[in-house]
Amino acid sequence: MYKHPWLPNLDLIDEMLKEIGVNSLDELFNDIPAEIKINRLLNVAKGKPLSEYEIEKEINEKVKKNVELQAPPFIGAGICPHYIPNVVKFIIGRSEFYTSYTPYQPEISQGLLQALFEYQSLMAELLDMDVVNASMYDWGSALAEAVLMANRINGKKTVLVPENANPFHKEVVRTWIGGKGIKIEEVKYDKNSGELDLEDLEKKSNIDDISAIYIQQPNFFGIFESNIEHVIDVAKHKRALSIVGVNLLSLGLIKPPGSYEADIVVGDGQELGLPLNFGGPLMGVFAVRWDMSLVRQMPGRIVGITKDTNGKMGFTLILQTREQFIKREKATSNITTNEALLAIANAVYLSLLGKEGMRELAEEIYFRSHYAAKKLTEIDNVSMPFRSDFFEEFAIRFPIEYDKISNKLKERKLQGGLKLSDYTSLFCVTEVHDKKSIDLLVSTIQEMINGVETS
């Protein structure tokens, strides 16, 4: 009888093989070509099951390889470090939320549905949008769903996307639209301001097949797009849908997308109470204005409020015929429950901050990021490639290769910015970067540059 060192209940394998009339596992997998089968033992762990003590010892050895940084990481690219109030962790750690998710008889879980309804309401107020779903996987998947949604609504095949939008989000979109016949056309940005090139936008939009126009606010370089309302007008003129990707914390300072009549809004709730953890988990935000042609095509779940037969208020999933409750090929998406727990974390975070707290936090981030940029550009031959105003993230150009600077920072247990080119890096500064941390970054870089220039 076949034995496997890792899987329990293996006596059942013989019973199952006998039931289906197959003599062995080799016979069962006979249709798989021999050249792609692995005919050797895999080098898994120690080659045998480990005891609890051995597993704990192995993990601790790996943990020792972690480097404790002297300051919060200065790398962002859309995923930035923020302080998370302990009450956020406490509430989502409660078993009612942490071990549960919306079941397929969702009305049984009234508490969870109400929490998600509160998330939708708070996010709708923040964005000034009418309808928000109960969450997506992340910004990239939300943007991809927005592109697919636009195609379903108007049947057009070309989507205009800025070159200065987050490249990681664009890669997700390209993956999701593969085989759909949808074309991504990139719009250039002004190399001096860092903002979208309006002339190129007019040129690229001069066709009848525009399904949607996307713009990110602030853009990938952290720069505020001052002409965003003009972009929305271009989309209206072309009878295309406007999609706005927005940094949620920046809304403490700038106008929300609903105020300039965006059709679809996407973003990421990572900024609102979620940790950094190998890039996840993230929490995609998806909102639309009040138009049933949009609402009916929204991906994801929507929690609504109603009354039962006794007149009591209750919460329910609404418009379920859009979702995976119907045939998969007819559903607008199959996103399922996804990031419900993290949506609740967002709701708790927003409730704690309130309007004034959001503004104060956004101002803190704005001033700290500008302080860091100012101190860095005081170093000889260090400059900013773009002249426009920015929030949280900013690009810095150096007189020496950034790889050398990055290596020096790592030696000092500092995580620098994201390399954009040989001499340019994108830095991130938030409320967790105090003056001491910023000054340490600046002095280390200055020492590195001065040492190279004098050698």
UniProtKB/Swiss-Prot annotation:
Subunit architecture: The glycine cleavage system is composed of four proteins: P, T, L and H. In this organism, the P 'protein' is a heterodimer of two subunits.
Q: Might you name a Gene Ontology BP term for this protein?
A: glycine decarboxylation via glycine cleavage system
Show the coiled coil region(s): none
Q: Which NCBIfam families match?
A: PRK00451.1 (NF001696)
Classification from the root reads: Archaea, Thermoproteota, Thermoprotei, Sulfolobales, Sulfolobaceae
Tell me the InterPro entries matching this sequence.
Answer: GcvPA, GDC-P_N, GDC_P, PyrdxlP-dep_Trfase, PyrdxlP-dep_Trfase_major, PyrdxlP-dep_Trfase_small
Q: What is this protein called?
A: Probable glycine dehydrogenase (decarboxylating) subunit 1
A molecular function GO annotation? glycine dehydrogenase (decarboxylating) activity
Biological function: The glycine cleavage system catalyzes the degradation of glycine. The P protein binds the alpha-amino group of glycine through its pyridoxal phosphate cofactor; CO(2) is released and the remaining methylamine moiety is then transferred to the lipoamide cofactor of the H protein.
Catalysed reactions, as listed in the record? N(6)-[(R)-lipoyl]-L-lysyl-[glycine-cleavage complex H protein] + glycine + H(+) = N(6)-[(R)-S(8)-aminomethyldihydrolipoyl]-L-lysyl-[glycine-cleavage complex H protein] + CO2
> Which Gene3D superfamilies has this protein been placed in?
Aspartate Aminotransferase, domain 1, Type I PLP-dependent aspartate aminotransferase-like (Major domain)
Q: Does the keyword Oxidoreductase apply?
A: yes
**Assigned EC number:** 1.4.4.2
Per the record, the domain of life is Archaea
Family recorded in the similarity comment: Belongs to the GcvP family. N-terminal subunit subfamily.
Which UniProt keywords are listed?
Oxidoreductase
Q: Which residue positions does the secretion signal occupy?
A: none
